[in-house]
């Protein structure tokens, strides 16, 4: 019996493998796969519908059409299995072998494989060291190649045309061999001796850069061939494999027609041309005819492998390009992305969602019909267990009739069985969550309102999919990891995701507001019960100010018990009643205020940190219920009267119109240019709009009421519209402004501002022109949104791909490295506090108390909220913490360097896929970012101009290291440093704020001066940039010639004339001269720079207005010239999504700035045409120089000392330069800060560590510099972890390790250059990746998540990590151990079977 069962058992090969290798197939290998040669192009007989013998669907080669039945019908049934029918030659077996048996075609002439020819760089070209053009000419029979020069002076590998060939044939006769087509190429490949070639190339890695690069490429390729045991001649095919027929099916349609796979067409062409060629060769046809046929065969093989790669694509009957083998695997609808990474899932359904306000957070409502369908296997099992149905068929019938017992069983199997809900697009981890189903009538799924923000769902027709976890393990994972009540924080930033919104917020806000002179004001209550009774009796208003005695519970630190404390609170009725739902341990002060949306979010956060997960979930549910109930009770509604138009509106608008008229008049009389007029008009209207909205908000937000003493007082308004905006429930000041103020300025689709504003608002109504203006720009917004979604999705995909294999693999890597974190301060304002930056990170070095230097926190501790409060109390302003970038774990990250798992609130677990989480956190808000680049101009830039800085706090003044200044004649201090900063310290010497001060600013404070908050620290002219002298002397002009280098400008109004430096190119000057100033001292000599013999020369830039006269005496700190900032081209600022993509792709920005390559003194060399020669000389006398285009803005002047990495030419920095000159830490800081700037502008919070994780992956490859004793080639790019492993092994043997330098790759490049070819091929450029991998004979170690999904295993992350470790441990055991385990398992099984049979016997 047992053996018979084994007979029927499906045979599955052992799935235990650790790696996948790809290579090239030799002709012998292809023949060994094949079950026979396909000789005829026929498919099936049109009369019998049976496959033709030796054709593309031949049953003899590929297997039977019907299970266990030969083609002619002589052998049927299972008893003949394995017999080969003597009449039709078909083996009697299962028909599914037609999916796996391959055939082959013997080619009459060899054909080159197009992938190795045309996929750049051409592998054939590299091996043979010929150009692609030449190889193509040979392959497609346009030229000969010399394969054996014999005794002639011809060179091997040389190309000759037909005429040359004839001439040489006459000259040398048969002394030499030259061939055409793939045969020639094949001969050349066979003639290569890899060992000799490799030696030659290894010795030839010298000479010019280009040559070295080329030789290194060839060397790598040859070594790849040698190592993988692949012969180069296999790149030319002698035998073509034929795909199994069931993978290229022929399907009969109704009406006697057939639908066929394109591959059949392509194969048919190859077979036709091949047979014809074979016949021609047998007939000894003329060379030219055979040659043409060979070329056609080559083309047919090309289009079978990759149609359209060369020449025109082959088309079918309907002019559509045929889908070749290559097209089947690449692209979105190819094998990788469509079938391997994006499978459809069984046991799933989808339906519309509706709101379920009565559900608990961990529940969802599941329609009965859906549940019945989804839980069928469980219902069938129960029916069998209960003995209601004996077979599956009977059970099916039972379920279909829908007897009451079925519904009872459904109730039972659904209990405690979580289901997963998913809303597309699933942009982050919270897009799929598990819930316990509650059966409901109807056909819509009910969703808990609090999880909507995580799913980004609303109830306007959204649909959601339901998936059922089947196995016990899956159910357990769903319950512990995915249950909605376990996911209450966003993994992106650690904020709560279950924050109430809209109605709930409005209800809670209304309840916790206080009102002057409410009913029952001033009453004192003994407890909340009494308040409740007074409220129910109608004696107390919710908003009335009262006093209540309340009990608070606080946790005792020693005993961990809750201890009560009671005190009298001044509060309102609503707040007192709300205090009933507070969990133990949450102080009342948290809700003793008007609860706006932000406050409620904070409240839930505090609750989670203080009271734990369970309490918080219950609390959130209670808040939700109260909010809905109170919003209903409050009865807030809006009417036209609520939209108060400010009284001042008419006068403000009239004033603005008057100003605009004045400017129009100035314009007509030629006093201002058109551009200035436009800017000023836009400015005026912008200001007026703001004034109107200020007046409107002032009027809306306050109302006058009479208090109980009869006085008129002001209180926060109870205007419904104001309450909605103020609470954060819906709407904002900007929207109210459009309803009740004035709509203001509108933008055109190109982003420019229309200068006539809409002065009306929605309450007054718009006229036709105003309506048209407002629709004009709005349409662009809708078009943008569609583009944005696609762009953002693509960014997320690239991010996911680059980090997909980054998993936390160990607890602690033991690194002593880290990066110093301090608060981000810009313009004296703290943009991101130290608290936000270091929360949940591990400390590297002991944190010392700033005053008494005692150890506050030991190294290796993760900072939580309590510790951070200690830090803040002590006033620590910088902490060195571990980051993902400094982690030393190979092929992964360690938990300590990553720190807190933001989505769960504790230290990250081993096995967490932090890479994917980082990619999702950055990609998910992508759709909220803007798409356009901002043109600075018009109103936008006006607001950004600052002309002074003031202190925000009291303290002592200090300056940073690069700050330099001189004292001018008036005794003012003038800044002459490019990157000077004023730092304010408090009395303990801790830095409180720092302000950047521009070149040429006047300092109003001195070092170590004590100042009060609000003091002006420095001021400057915001509209011009000065050129300042550091020394005293008499001005001597050089090259200042009117009409050549300068022009006189006379001001129309004042009549004063100034000299403006002009571009001499326009004046047709031959040599480029630059106007400059030298200083002459009292003795008539040139003033020298102290310590050098350089004269002080100060050059003027084009567009500068000269402020001094020739021969004038100047003192230090005086302004020689001013450059108007208006005159400069305004740079477009790339913002939003494109900026983020640009940073992660590590693109070199256009018009990039230059950084100083070394520390030294600046000088200017001889100018070339249109370029300035900028030189830096270091203390040792080494000189570095760069040519800078004239129009660029050089930030340094002659004789200035610069530090390595300082900006010397204006423009955005190039990340590659930052990495090279300033190192990894500085680069990471740059990318993190820049990305955060974009997101911060949109109000999106993302934790820095996510960006760091991405940067780590961008830096994961290194360039080998000195090869040492390794087998690498200098200049080769390798995986950092792999190289470090190799180096460790070498050190252990006492050999020389390789040295390397860091390499920054953009995310696309980094994804494609990963060691895993499966992951790279499924990302982009599939052909190129696979070609390269096959030639190198690459092994994929299946380390990442993607590779494992593709080969169909559990991913090595989370619970899958344990599975893989156990599997590897089992592989390491020896056979005896394995046998012992198997025997013990079998014994257990037999024992249990014996027990059940005993029980059954007893029962009978």
Curated annotation (Swiss-Prot):
InterPro entries for this protein: DNA-dir_RpoC_beta_prime, DNA-dir_RpoC_beta_prime_bact, RNA_pol_asu, RNA_pol_N, RNA_pol_Rpb1_1, RNA_pol_Rpb1_3, RNA_pol_Rpb1_3_sf, RNA_pol_Rpb1_4
Note on how the cofactor is bound: Binds 1 Mg(2+) ion per subunit. Binds 2 Zn(2+) ions per subunit.
Binding site for Zn(2+) 2: 813, 887, 894, 897
GO biological process: DNA-templated transcription
GO MF, any single term: magnesium ion binding
Enzyme class: transferase
Enzyme Commission identifier(s): 2.7.7.6
CDD domains: RNAP_beta'_C, RNAP_beta'_N
Domain of life: Bacteria
Gene3D superfamilies hit by this protein: 1.10.132.30, 1.10.150.390, 1.10.1790.20, 1.10.40.90, 2.40.40.20, 2.40.50.100, RNA polymerase II, clamp domain, RNA polymerase Rpb1, domain 3
Pfam family, one: RNA_pol_Rpb1_1
Kinase recorded as keyword: no
Alphabetical UniProt keywords: DNA-directed RNA polymerase, Magnesium, Metal-binding, Nucleotidyltransferase, Transcription, Transferase, Zinc
PANTHER family xref list: DNA-DIRECTED RNA POLYMERASE (PTHR19376), DNA-DIRECTED RNA POLYMERASE SUBUNIT BETA (PTHR19376:SF54)
NCBIfam families for this protein: rpoC_TIGR (TIGR02386)
Protein name as catalogued: DNA-directed RNA polymerase subunit beta'
Origin species: Polaromonas naphthalenivorans (strain CJ2)
Gene behind this protein: rpoC
């Amino acid at each position: 019996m047992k053996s018979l069962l084994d007979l029927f058992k499906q045979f599955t090969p052992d799935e235990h493998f650790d790696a996948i290798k790809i290579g090239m197939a030799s002709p012998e290998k292809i023949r060994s796969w094949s079950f026979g040669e396909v000789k005829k192009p026929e498919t099936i007989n049109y009369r019998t519908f049976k496959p033709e013998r030796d054709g593309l669907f031949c049953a003899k080669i590929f297997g039977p059409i019907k299970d266990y039945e030969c083609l002619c019908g002589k052998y049927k049934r299972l008893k003949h299995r394995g017999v080969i029918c003597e009449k039709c030659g078909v083996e009697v077996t299962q028909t599914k072998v037609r999916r796996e048996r391959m055939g082959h075609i013997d080619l009459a002439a060899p054909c080159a494989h197009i992938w190795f020819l045309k996929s750049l760089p051409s592998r054939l070209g590299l091996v043979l060291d010929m150009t692609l053009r030449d190889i193509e000419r040979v392959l497609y029979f346009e030229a000969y190649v010399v394969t054996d020069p014999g005794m002639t002076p011809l060179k091997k590998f040389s190309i000759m045309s037909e005429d040359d060939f004839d001439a040489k044939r006459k000259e040398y006769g048969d002394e030499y061999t030259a061939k055409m087509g793939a045969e020639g190429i094949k001969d050349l490949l066979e003639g290569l001796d890899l060992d000799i070639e490799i030696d030659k190339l290894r010795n030839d890695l010298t000479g010019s850069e280009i040559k070295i690069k080329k030789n290194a490429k060839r060397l790598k390729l040859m070594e790849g061939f040698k190592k993988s045991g692949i012969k180069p001649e296999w790149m030319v095919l002698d035998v073509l494999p034929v795909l199994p027929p069931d993978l290229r099916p022929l399907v009969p349609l109704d009406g006697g027609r057939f639908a066929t796979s394109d591959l059949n067409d392509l194969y048919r062409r190859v077979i036709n041309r091949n047979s014809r060629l074979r016949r021609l060769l047998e007939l000894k046809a003329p060379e030219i005819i055979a040659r043409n046929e060979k070329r056609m065969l080559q083309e047919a093989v090309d289009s079978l492998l990759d149609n359209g790669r060369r020449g025109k694509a082959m088309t079918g009957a309907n002019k559509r390009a045929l889908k070749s083998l290559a097209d089947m695997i690449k692209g979105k609808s190819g094998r990788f992305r469509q079938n391997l990474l994006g499978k459809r899932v069984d046991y799933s359904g989808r339906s519309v969602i509706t709101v379920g306000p009565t559900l608990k957070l961990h529940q969802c409502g599941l329609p009965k019909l859906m549940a019945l369908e989804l839980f069928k296997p469980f219902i069938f099992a129960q029916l069998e267990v209960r003995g209601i149905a004996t077979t599956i068929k009977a059970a099916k019938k039972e379920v279909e009739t829908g007897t009451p017992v079925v519904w009872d069983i459904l109730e039972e199997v659904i209990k405690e069985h979580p289901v997963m809900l998913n809303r597309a697009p699933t942009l982050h981890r919270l897009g799929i969550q598990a819930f316990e189903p509650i059966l409901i009538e109807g056909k819509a799924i009910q969703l808990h309102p609090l999880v909507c923000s995580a799913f980004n769902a609303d109830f306007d027709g959204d649909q959601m999919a339901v998936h059922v976890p089947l196995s016990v393990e899956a159910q357990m994972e769903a319950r512990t990891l995915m249950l909605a009540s376990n996911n209450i924080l966003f993994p992106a930033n650690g904020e709560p995701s279950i924050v109430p919104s809209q109605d709930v917020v409005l209800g809670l806000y209304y309840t916790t507001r206080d009102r002057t002179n409410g009913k029952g004001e001033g009453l004192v209550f003994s407890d909340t019960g009494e308040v409740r009774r007074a409220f129910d009796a109608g004696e107390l208003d919710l908003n009335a100010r009262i006093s209540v005695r309340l009990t608070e519970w606080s946790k005792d630190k020693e005993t961990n018990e809750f201890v009560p404390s009671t005190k009298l609170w001044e509060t309102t009725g609503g707040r007192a009643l709300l205090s009933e739902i507070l969990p133990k341990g949450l102080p009342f002060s948290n809700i003793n205020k008007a609860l706006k949306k932000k406050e409620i979010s904070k409240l839930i956060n505090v609750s989670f940190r203080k009271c734990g997960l369970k309490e918080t979930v219950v609390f959130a549910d209670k808040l939700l219920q109260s909010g809905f109930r109170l919003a209903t009770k409050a009865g807030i509604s809006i009417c036209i009267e609520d939209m108060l138009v400010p009284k001042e509106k008419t006068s403000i608008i009239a004033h603005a119109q008057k100003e605009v008229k004045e400017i129009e008049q100035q314009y007509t009389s030629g006093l201002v240019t058109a551009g200035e007029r436009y800017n000023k008009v836009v400015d005026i209207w912008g200001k007026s709009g703001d004034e109107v909205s200020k007046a409107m908000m002032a009027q809306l937000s306050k109302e006058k009421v009479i208090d109980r003493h009869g006085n008129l007082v002001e209180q926060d308004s109870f205007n419904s519209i104001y309450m909605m905006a103020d609470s954060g429930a819906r709407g904002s000041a900007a929207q109210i402004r459009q309803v009740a103020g004035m709509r203001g300025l509108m933008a055109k689709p190109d982003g420019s501002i229309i200068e006539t504003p809409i002065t009306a608002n929605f309450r007054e109504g718009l006229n036709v022109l105003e309506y048209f203006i407002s629709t004009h720009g709005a349409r662009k917004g809708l078009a943008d949104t569609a583009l944005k979604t696609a762009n953002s999705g693509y960014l997320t995909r690239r991010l996911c791909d680059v980090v997909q294999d980054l998993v936390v693999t160990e607890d602690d890597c033991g690194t002593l490295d880290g990066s110093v974190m301090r608060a981000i301060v810009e313009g004296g304002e703290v943009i991101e506090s130290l608290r936000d930056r270091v929360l949940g990170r591990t400390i590297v070095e002991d944190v010392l108390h700033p005053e008494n230097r005692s150890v506050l926190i030991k190294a290796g501790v993760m900072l939580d909220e309590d510790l951070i409060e200690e830090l803040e109390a002590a006033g620590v302003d910088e902490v060195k913490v571990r980051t993902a970038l400094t982690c030393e774990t190979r092929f992964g990250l360690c938990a300590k360097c990553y720190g807190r798992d933001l989505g769960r609130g504790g230290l990250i677990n081993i096995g967490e896929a932090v890479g994917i989480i980082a990619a999702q956190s950055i990609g998910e808000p992508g759709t909220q970012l803007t798409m356009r680049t901002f043109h600075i101009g018009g109103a936008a830039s006006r607001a950004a101009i600052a002309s002074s800085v003031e202190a925000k706090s009291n303290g002592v003044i200090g300056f940073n290291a690069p700050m330099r200044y001189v004292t001018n004649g008036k005794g003012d201090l003038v800044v002459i440093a490019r990157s000077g900063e004023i730092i304010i310290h408090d009395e303990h010497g801790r830095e409180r704020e720092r302000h950047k001060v521009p070149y040429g600013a006047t300092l109003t404070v001195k070092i170590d001066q004590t100042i009060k908050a609000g003091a002006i620290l420095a001021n400057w002219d915001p509209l011009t940039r000065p050129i300042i002298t550091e020394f005293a002397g008499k001005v001597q002009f050089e090259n200042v010639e009117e009409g050549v280098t300068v022009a006189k400008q006379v001001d129309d109004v004042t009549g004063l004339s100034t000299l403006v430096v002009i571009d001499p190119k326009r004046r047709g000057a031959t040599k480029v001269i630059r106007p400059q100033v030298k200083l002459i001292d009292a003795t008539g000599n040139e003033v020298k720079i102290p310590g050098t013999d350089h004269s002080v020369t100060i050059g003027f830039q084009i567009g500068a207005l000269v402020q001094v006269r020739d021969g004038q005496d100047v003192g230090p700190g005086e302004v020689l010239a001013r450059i108007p900032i208006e005159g400069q081209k305004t740079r477009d600022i790339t913002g939003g999504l494109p900026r983020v993509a640009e940073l992660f792709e590590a693109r070199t920005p256009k018009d990039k700035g230059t950084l100083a390559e070394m520390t030294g003194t600046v000088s200017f060399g001889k100018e070339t045409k249109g370029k300035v020669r900028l030189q830096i000389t270091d203390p040792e006398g080494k000189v570095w120089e760069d040519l800078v285009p004239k129009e660029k803005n050089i930030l340094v002047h002659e004789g200035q000392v610069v530090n390595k990495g300082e900006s010397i030419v204006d423009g955005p920095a190039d990340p590659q330069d930052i990495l090279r000159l300033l190192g990894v830490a500085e680069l990471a800081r740059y990318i993190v800060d820049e990305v955060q700037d974009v997101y911060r502008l949109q109000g999106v919070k993302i934790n820095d560590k996510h960006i760091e994780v991405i940067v780590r992956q961008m830096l994961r490859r290194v360039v080998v510099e000195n090869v040492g004793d390794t087998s690498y080639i200098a200049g080769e790019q390798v995986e950092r972890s792999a190289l470090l492993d190799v180096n460790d092994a070498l050190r252990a043997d006492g050999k020389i390790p390789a040295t390397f330098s860091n390499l920054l790759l953009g995310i696309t490049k980094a994804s494609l250059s990963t060691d895993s070819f499966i992951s790279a091929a499924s990302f982009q450029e599939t052909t190129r990746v696979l070609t390269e991998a096959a030639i190198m004979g690459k092994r994929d170690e299946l380390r990442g998540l993607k590779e494992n999904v593709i080969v169909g295993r559990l991913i090595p992350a989370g619970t899958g990590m344990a599975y893989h470790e156990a599997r590897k441990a089992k592989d390491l055991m020896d056979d005896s151990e394995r046998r012992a385990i198997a025997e013990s398992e079998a014994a257990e099984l037999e024992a249990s079977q014996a027990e059940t049979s005993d029980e059954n016997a007893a029962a009978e």
